[in-house]
Amino acid sequence: MPTILNLLNVNKRGRTLHDMRHDSKDKQTFRMKHLRYLLLAGLLALQIPGMAATHPIDVQPAFWWSGMHNTSLQIMLHAKDIGKCNVSIEATDIKVDSIYRPANANYLFVYLDTHKAHPQRFHLSLQQGRKKQRIAYELKARDNQPKAQGFDAADVLYLLMPDRFANADATNDVVKGLKENISNQAPDNRHGGDLAGMTRHLNYLDSLGVTTIWPTPLLCNDMPAGSYHGYAITNYYEIDPRYGSNKDYKLFVDAAHKRGMKVVQDMVFNHCGSENFLFTDLPDSTWFNNNSCYTQTGYKITAATDAYASQVDKFNAQDGWFVSSMPDFNQRNTHVMRYLTQNAIWWIEFAGIDGIRQDTYPYADRDAMAQWCKELKTQYPHLNIVGETWLNSNVGVSAWQKDSKVAKGLCNSELPTVMDFPLMSLLNSALDETTNEWDQGLARIYNYLSQDAVYADPTHLLTFLSNHDTNRFACVQAQADLKWRYKQAITLLLTLRGIPQLYYGDELAMAANKSKGDGALRQNFPGGFANDSINAFTGEHLTPLMQHTHALTRKLLQWRKGCDAVKWGSFCHFAPKEGVYVYARQYKGHVVTVMINGTNTPACVDLAHYAEVLPKPYAHDVLSGRRVNLDKGSLQMGVREVLVLDFKK
């Protein structure tokens, strides 16, 4: 639980004392404030019966902003018996709208009406009998820094796991009081990556050509084991101290913005960690599903959109818990949903993030999450939100996208972007087959794309080869050694419709198999940790395969940045013919045509068949850098060869 030092004072720049004690020039100020608030904590403990120095008041959110679209502000107060207090306010043009006192007297939820309020500091006054207490609070002015810029098909996301990317600050490897710290490099232990490492290596990511960084959750996960992955949050308003501070996170986002890059925050509103104070000290039994008692989900999330589903299947899918250590939030409780909604807004305003990835999206309440999306999009019109929609069919995925054509009888999800898991599955299997004209190899990708009418907006599909929960694209080293396999996959990923996403290490041909555990999929990035023999950030000691894969990835990414045809263009494809799959992207007269030989034999391409996407008798091949002549009626392609023909040059 945050200390009273953090909760009762945040200075004008939003810096907590935790931030200041790591800043040498502020050490004296920190000592003075530390003493001042220790005295204050003792004084407050005398004012409220049962409130000892070991039970400071937790105030969430710690501050807010004026001028927000939704002018109702929920302030949660958490301390011993605080719910027995009466509340009043000392402020200008702010009034107490309502009070929510849950069954647990350790909570008090104060709802304020701020629609006339200007930026100001004010006080909440608590009283129990003759005992009084004043809590300082601030309504800040909104700044004009970039935030909620969104992301779209012009971007390429780079998914990384902070604990496994780079350790640049050894001082936070062990944080006193937290349940898990670095012990060894076992796959499921903490390894020490942090925000300092991510910030230090922004130049690497910028040079690679990605535009948007998606780290897995950075919020505090004070769990006894497995805390490195970040999906069992124990404090929704604090960056995990083993990564750094809230200030460090804002500095990371600012540094990305200075390079013209964006940041997507991974949020988890379906569940939290079992060590979260909201679960260990329940406001009441309705905050979590099944009366806050563990009931395992059946994972059959198709039941949520199945017109024939039984009530028990629907219940098990959405109200069941992912695992026993991840209590399942009840989003139908309006106080829960207000808490979560404000948390998302707080991080956008405080850190300036550009987009949100929402974990396990279909497992949460559809109606509540639709309202969440709608409120955020009203406040931030350019914001993009992608939900983790892990279903195995395009129909299943499409039911969760805004304006879905297939979600009959359900509310509009309002979710702009969904994840194209079916395409990921195809890319991982079809390329290992020999393409025919019907149902093998690239024909399977052709068939899948031909069904895009099922999606409300195919351009708002997040596409990827793998992520932190799946086999890597190369699940064994033998696959990684097939250079053509990755060349075909990365070409498809970066030139088809949708918003591409890379998983850290894709550009280095990293291989891993989920059968060895999730930790095996989340290897350390080479060069991010002390004593690494290979340094991908500098290129030192890269293997020939790593060098080849990195160069190929960088070439395509940098080219894509300047190619509007593959970002915004229309899509036209041809049924595979003699093992070759051909498609084109066209935008304002600019044509890019891709040809892929999906067989283990050379191919002779009949160019007349593809005349409508060959506007000139020659083109520039992006991959080889050579000029390709197209004036002889046919074109020879090598085994598994890929051509990316850019007609702009």
Positions of the model-derived regions?
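Immunoglobulin-like IPT/TIG beta-sandwich domains and homologous Ig-like subdomains
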Residues: H69-R121, S125-G129
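Low-complexity, Pro/Ser/Thr- and charge-rich linker/hinge segments at domain boundaries
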Residues: W65, K140-L159, R164, A168
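Beta-strand/beta-sandwich contexts
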Residues: A53-G83, A141
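C-terminal beta-strand-rich structural cap/linker in extracellular carbohydrate-active enzymes
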Residues: L630-K649
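Edge beta-strands of extracellular beta-sandwich domains
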Residues: K132-A141
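Loop/helix patches that line or flank the sugar-binding groove of alpha-linked glycan CAZymes
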Residues: A168-R190, L391, P458, F464-N467, ...
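Active-site-proximal helices and loops of the catalytic beta/alpha 8
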Residues: V253, H271, N343-I345, E349-Y455, ...
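Substrate-binding/active-site clefts of carbohydrate-active enzymes
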Residues: F165-I345, F350, M369-Y380, N384, ...
